[in-house]
Amino acid sequence: MTKIHFRPYNPNQTVLFPQRIDEDIAENDPVRMVDALVEGLNLESFRKLYKECGRSPYHPRMMLKVILYAYMNNIYSCRKIEKLLHRDIHYIWLAGYEKPDFITINRFRNRVKKEINEVFTQTVLLLSSKGFISLNVEYIDGTKIESKANKYTFVWRKTVERNRERLMKKIHVLLGQIDDVIAREKSSENNEEVGFTPAMLAEMAGELRHALEQVSEPSAKEEKTELKKKRKQLKELEEHRDKLQEYDCHPETLQERNSYSKTDKDATFMRMKEDAMRNGQTKPGYNLQIGTENQFITDFALFPNPTDTLTLIPFLQSFSNRYDRMAHTVVADSGYGSEENYRFMSENGMEAYVKYNYFHMEQRPRFKPDPFKAENFYYNEEHDFCICPMGQRMRRIGTRNVKTASGYVNENARYRAVRCEGCPLRCRCFKAKGNRTIELNHRLRQYKRRAKELLCSEKGLKHRGQRCIEPEAVFGQIKNNMNYKRFRHFGKDKVFMDFAFLAIAFNIKKMCAKLTKKGMNWLIRLFYELTTAVFRCWEHINQRNLQKIAA
């Protein structure tokens, strides 16, 4: 029988000259890109977050590397990151054999809630300098992501207003039953129209309690019953006071929203795409808006609006505040097509490849415009009149201003036919009595006409095709590939911080994928060497400045 010779195996063998840990990491491994990129960032703003006295904290650059690399690998739990710092060679190398616990990691994330936004901006500018993006085109889209809060923690504005009115009526009835001069005076001074405040009820309850304490303990049965009744009424008054104070706090939290969650007061109840019961149940969440270019996230923001229409202008302003410039080209779907949005983009010199309602329907081969719809009537701009399908002239009778939820005023011109009685097309035209009246928004029609020209042009067709694989692909990768389907923190500031880490990790991961796909591993090494050299130069200059200050 042939003897089998196995390779020597001794896991407890002592090495005389230990090798460097990064020798077992491939040169084109993404962990090297994370290390190089973070080394090239300016983290001077992180210094103000630490105290000069006490125990020396972990280096923020090391903590940032570890968290970003964990997010790149779909690991968002601080406890799992702590385990990997003891087991995984990539995390051990990034941390330099440091082993912060999960509390320290989570505390660092919460500490850099504002500074991480600046890190994201630096990362995008670095991508722009390397030629991955130009920041001239912004593909915008939104998605609703569920909050960590429970779906049964809702507070509705209408319910609060209705219950507050009922409580006011109960208070008036209760004060009418209390046999006390002070209570009667307060009740007469404050009728149902004026209402009460928690401070008034607290004052009244205190005076009534003081009056009851002055009364000696009665001996008769009827007097005991009456005293017991008054104490019960006092207890009810105090309960109404507490409830009224609770109802008065709700509008401050709601502000312009119609709902919020008790456990996550920044979350708004919305209908999500993931509806397992198919009953349209609302869940607490945020409307996440992102801007992408070449499938890199260039900007992001969180909004309480369930729809996308009111988010476009503040989102474009967010892009301007971040990069001190406006995007030259904006591409978005029909959810953003409104007069206010078109006007803002036109005034800021943007090319708006933004669809409007019924745009896709108009592009169908079998589409035929309905001649009886007001927007399809012939309009004479010179003499300001419309012509109905029967050929009758419709004269201008006035203007109606419509105020939107954002406060913008739409001007709708009103036109009315002279005589619709006996018209053979009346049954198909309208069903109301009298002569037909229509409203037209001429400014919006001009914006739609301009948008249609841009969207149907050769450049517009290219942007329309690109939009389908820009933000939609990013959302698909975030939700399915990176398993980021629900926020893991309470509060808008913490949710924003968590997604900022994810956006940075996503951009680094995308950059590594693009370089590796093109077989440009040598570029990764070059990028590593350049960023490391820049960081060393910046550190040397900063050290010299500190020495001058110390001198």
Give a label for each model feature.
Residues P8, S56, I67, N74-R87, ...:
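Anion-binding and metal-coordination hotspots
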Residues L94:
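Conserved active-site neighborhood of enzyme catalytic/cofactor-binding cores
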